[in-house]
């Protein structure tokens, strides 16, 4: 039996400071908590759930698989139940990303509508996207934007028996041939997700191999279609990432300002908050504030951070990741939280009830109990943003004096160099030069550390920072994407001074270029961009060498060192389906099935080229990933 945890370790003083204040408030107001307070009392954990051998999809259950009871009432074995649960998780995760893509494409399509505020911010990104999708690149920007949007929307609504044209446009031809031979070309995204739910309902599909193949198809939908599509559209509408310097950390919460915190993933729904804050500044001053600050948090905050150079000064910076949001609200300085997707924690409800924090949801998929729902649509984007900001101003006016005794001003803030992306790196360094550094061995390879943070695999933020340090000291350049970026920022890894933690060769490169050894590559949605970058590197190497180099040969690896939820499982399925070497921690809930475990750990390299590494010790994970990079270098002869 697992022993009861008394506390959760933190990666940095910034988070710890906030949680300690929340604990003090909790003594007075029991409803005011953070995940760090709730986590220790959630033990022991159910071993059947952790192994994936628990099922409750009919009234004869719940059933659990043990040595004495190897089959459920229906006859389902551990292999069936684990594969079914896993497919359901991945289907839900893929559905989340397809929802984001649908809304982003709607925003892009509205560019041609005179009533819509959306405009083309980056024509280069627009033309590049049209080229990737195999569309006409020569038309008027509005026409090209509309064609891209319609191409995406038609594709995600496509039936499952029709192959996804978006997928076939984004993924290299030689990979398409392989997927065709395996029968893995996905159909329309929504249909693939729908049929996954049908398969996993009561007494339907009981073939674990078929369900695992469906997981791979959903992975192929997740990365090349959904993730790549959302960030491509964000580049077009809001500007591609541009290298710049920002301030971040909890200390950006200023008691003299109306502070509006964001939670979610959909920049298309949130960008106009920064404009509305600028427009309504005088109203804020009339309410007694110096102005309005948009506080980036969770993945949408990462998207703001990546595009900070394009935003007005009302964007204050990135304050914290998923598990920091309630702790930030506990400071008493957050006047409103605007949500449109996860990670929007249910516990935020109590900050409205007890600290009068205004809660606004602009997409009902992320409506917190008690939040005001102001539904977004492209034509009303500015109006919705202005209403949300006005509510924040009213909250500031009514709540600050009322809760003055509960306010805590965080001390921790830091400087970051952010805005790294495909175009900005090409402009600053040139990808050919990056490849040359890799070929020469100055940089041994690239490791994308991505996704969530959690509390269960070593503490909030802890493993991500440990792994990043392990990689950079081995001269491996790290790309950060997702909530892990909050960990890297608080640890100072986005500051060029962090080069001193890198190996001699990587340190010299960073010092010469004035960049950190860990590059902020955007939100978890940017995982699709990183996958596409690997495609492009493989294409370049094929052209240079004339050899049939494939994705598994590229000296690049990935890690989700603190995966949290179903979207992360979809991300992992995407990487593995595309042939990428991937490390994960904690152990996924599949160990109750020998077949599923063997497929994921042993059989995948022969199927897709993907390789899964499960390791909870970050020092050992760093060693293994570095070894994998060296194996890839050896295969390339470099």
From Swiss-Prot:
What cofactor does its activity depend on?
[4Fe-4S] cluster; [Ni-4Fe-5S] cluster
Record bears the keyword Metal-binding: yes
Which sites bind [4Fe-4S] cluster 1? 46
Q: Where does [Ni-4Fe-5S] cluster bind?
A: 265, 299, 343, 452, 483, 524
Q: What does this protein's record comment on cofactor binding?
A: Binds 3 [4Fe-4S] clusters per homodimer.
Q: What is its EC number?
A: 1.2.7.4
The protein's UniProt keywords, in alphabetical order, are: 4Fe-4S, Iron, Iron-sulfur, Metal-binding, Nickel, Oxidoreductase
Q: What class of enzyme is it?
A: oxidoreductase
User: Which CDD domains does its entry note?
Assistant: CODH (cd01915)
Record bears the keyword Ion transport = no
List ligand-binding residues for [4Fe-4S] cluster 2.
Answer: 55, 58, 63, 74
Which GO MF term does the entry hold, naming one? nickel cation binding
Task: Name the reaction it catalyses.
Answer: CO + 2 oxidized [2Fe-2S]-[ferredoxin] + H2O = 2 reduced [2Fe-2S]-[ferredoxin] + CO2 + 2 H(+)
Give an example GO biological process: response to hydrogen peroxide
Quaternary state and interactors: Homodimer.
- Per the entry's comment, what about the domains? Cluster B is an all-cysteinyl-liganded 4Fe-4S cluster; cluster C is a mixed Ni-Fe-S cluster which is the active site of CO oxidation. Cluster D is also an all-cysteinyl-liganded 4Fe-4S cluster that bridges the two subunits of the CODH dimer.
Recorded hits in NCBIfam families, A to Z, give: CO_DH_cata (TIGR01702)
Q: What does this protein do?
A: CODH oxidizes carbon monoxide coupled, via CooF, to the reduction of a hydrogen cation by a hydrogenase (possibly CooH).
What the record says about family reads: Belongs to the Ni-containing carbon monoxide dehydrogenase family.
The protein here is known as Carbon monoxide dehydrogenase
Species: Methanopyrus kandleri (strain AV19 / DSM 6324 / JCM 9639 / NBRC 100938)
Give the lineage. Archaea, Methanobacteriati, Methanobacteriota, Methanomada group, Methanopyri
Q: Give the encoding gene's name.
A: cooS
């Amino acid at each position: 039996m697992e022993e009861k945890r008394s506390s959760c370790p933190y990666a940095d003083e910034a988070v710890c400071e906030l949680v300690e204040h929340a604990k003090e408030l909790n003594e007075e107001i029991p409803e005011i908590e953070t995940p760090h307070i709730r986590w220790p009392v959630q033990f022991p954990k159910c071993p059947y759930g952790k192994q994936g051998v628990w099922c409750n999809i009919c009234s004869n259950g719940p059933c659990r698989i043990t040595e004495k009871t190897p089959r459920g009432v229906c006859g389902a074995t551990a292999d069936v139940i684990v594969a079914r649960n896993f497919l359901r998780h991945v289907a839900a995760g893929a559905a989340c990303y397809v929802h984001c893509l649908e809304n982003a494409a709607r925003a892009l399509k509205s560019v041609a509508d005179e009533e819509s505020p959306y405009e083309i911010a980056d024509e280069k990104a627009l033309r590049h996207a049209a080229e990737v999708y195999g569309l006409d690149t020569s038309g008027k920007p509005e026409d090209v934007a509309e064609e891209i949007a319609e191409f995406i929307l038609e594709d995600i609504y496509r039936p499952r028996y029709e192959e996804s044209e978006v997928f076939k446009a984004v993924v290299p031809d030689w990979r398409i041939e392989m997927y065709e031979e395996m029968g893995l070309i996905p159909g329309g995204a929504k249909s693939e997700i729908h049929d996954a739910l049908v398969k996993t309902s009561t007494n339907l599909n009981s073939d674990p191999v078929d369900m695992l193949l469906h997981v791979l198809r959903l992975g192929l939908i997740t990365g090349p279609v959904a993730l790549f599509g959302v960030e491509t559209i964000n580049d077009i509408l809001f500007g591609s990432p541009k290298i710049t310097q920002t301030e971040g950390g909890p200390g950006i919460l200023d008691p003299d300002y109306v502070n509006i915190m964001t939670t979610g993933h959909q920049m298309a729904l949130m960008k106009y908050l920064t404009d509305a804050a600028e427009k309504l500044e005088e109203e804020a001053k009339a309410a007694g504030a110096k102005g309005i600050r948009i506080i980036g948090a969770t993945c949408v905050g990462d998207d703001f951070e990546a595009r900070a150079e394009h935003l007005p000064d009302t964007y204050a910076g990135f304050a914290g990741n998923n598990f920091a949001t309630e702790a930030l609200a506990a400071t008493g300085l957050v006047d409103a939280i605007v949500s449109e997707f996860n990670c929007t924690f249910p516990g935020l409800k109590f900050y409205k009830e007890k600290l009068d924090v205004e809660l606004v949801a602009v997409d009902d998929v992320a409506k917190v109990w008690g939040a005001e729902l102001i539904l977004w649509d492209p034509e009303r984007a500015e109006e919705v943003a202005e209403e949300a900001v006005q509510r924040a101003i009213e909250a500031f006016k009514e709540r600050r004096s009322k809760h003055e005794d509960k306010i805590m001003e965080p001390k921790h803030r830091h400087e970051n160099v952010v805005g790294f992306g495909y175009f900005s790196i090409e402009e600053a360094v040139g990808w050919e030069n990056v490849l040359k550094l890799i070929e020469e061995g100055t940089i041994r390879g690239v490791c994308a550390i991505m996704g969530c943070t959690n509390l269960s695999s070593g503490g909030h933020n802890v493993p991500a920072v440990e792994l990043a340090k392990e990689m950079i000291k081995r001269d491996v350049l790290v790309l950060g994407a997702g909530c892990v970026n909050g960990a890297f920022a608080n640890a100072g890894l986005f500051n060029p001074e962090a080069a001193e933690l890198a190996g001699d060769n990587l340190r010299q490169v960073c010092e010469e270029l004035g960049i950190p050894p860990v590059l902020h590559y955007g939100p978890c949605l940017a995982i699709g961009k990183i996958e596409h970058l690997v495609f492009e590197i493989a294409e370049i190497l094929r052209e240079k060498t004339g050899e049939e180099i494939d994705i598994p040969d590229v000296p690049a690896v990935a890690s989700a060192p603190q995966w949290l939820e179903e979207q992360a499982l979809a991300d992992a399925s995407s990487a593995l389906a595309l042939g990428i070497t991937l490390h994960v921690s904690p152990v996924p809930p599949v160990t109750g099935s020998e077949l599923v475990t063997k497929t994921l750990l042993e059989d995948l390299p022969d199927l897709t080229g993907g390789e899964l590494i499960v390791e909870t010790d970050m020092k050992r994970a760093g060693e293994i990933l570095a070894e994998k990079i060296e194996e890839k270098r050896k295969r390339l002869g470099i």
